[in-house]
């Protein structure tokens, strides 16, 4: 089922839109920004105001996406420069494809992975992980599959610097 997006902004939109001159991908995302339904899945009490000011995603397809399906989920996500995404996990398996910027992925049982554009990181179901963005922040395509598609990630510990 198709669901017409209802435009919903996030505090980071002006930052994303200002990146339009950095390349075609940024320009395309900046053009979509005012028409997309941006989502944040945490509260200020959970992650702090700084995190919320520098984070958000668009669900392309999935239980709450533009294209509604229970088979899988796809997001385009933005995490700002130097942002730390605290330890969290979710039942669904997850793959990140870094589109722009850099991110240090640290996951339980895996060696740390510092990835740039084209880098891919897989997280198993229930695997706790953190992310630390590089100096440019990160745009990524994030894919979920398996059980727990409609659930949000849950934090395992309070953020280090909220």
Where are the regions a protein language model picked out?
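Short acidic-glycine-tyrosine-enriched beta hairpin
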Residues: 71, 109-128
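Conserved hydrophobic/aromatic beta-strand scaffold that supports enzyme active sites
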Residues: 57, 74-78, 95, 112, ...
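Short beta-strand His + acidic residue motifs that chelate non-heme Fe in jelly-roll/DSBH
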Residues: 85-88, 105-106, 123, 128-134
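A short hydrophobic beta-strand segment most commonly corresponding to one strand
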Residues: 95-97, 122, 135-155
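A short, N-terminal "cap"/entry segment at the start of jelly-roll beta-barrel domains
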Residues: 1-70
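Non-catalytic C-terminal accessory modules of carbohydrate-active enzymes
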Residues: 157-161
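A short beta-loop-beta micro-motif enriched in histidine and acidic residues
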Residues: 66-73, 81-95
């Amino acid at each position: 089922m198709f669901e017409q997006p209802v435009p919903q902004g996030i505090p980071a939109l002006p930052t994303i839109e200002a990146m339009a001159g950095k390349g075609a991908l940024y320009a395309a995302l900046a053009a979509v920004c005012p028409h997309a339904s941006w989502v944040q899945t945490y509260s200020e009490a959970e992650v702090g105001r700084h995190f919320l000011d520098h984070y958000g995603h668009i669900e392309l397809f999935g239980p709450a996406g533009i294209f509604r399906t229970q088979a899988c989920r796809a997001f385009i996500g933005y995490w700002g420069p130097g942002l730390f995404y605290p330890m969290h996990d979710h039942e669904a398996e997850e793959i990140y494809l870094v589109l722009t910027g850099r991110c240090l992925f640290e996951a339980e049982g895996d060696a740390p992975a510092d990835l740039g554009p084209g880098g891919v990181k897989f997280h198993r179901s229930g695997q706790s992980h953190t992310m630390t963005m590089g100096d440019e922040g990160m745009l990524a395509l994030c894919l979920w599959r398996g059980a727990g598609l409609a659930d949000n990630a849950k934090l395992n510990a309070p953020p280090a610097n909220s």
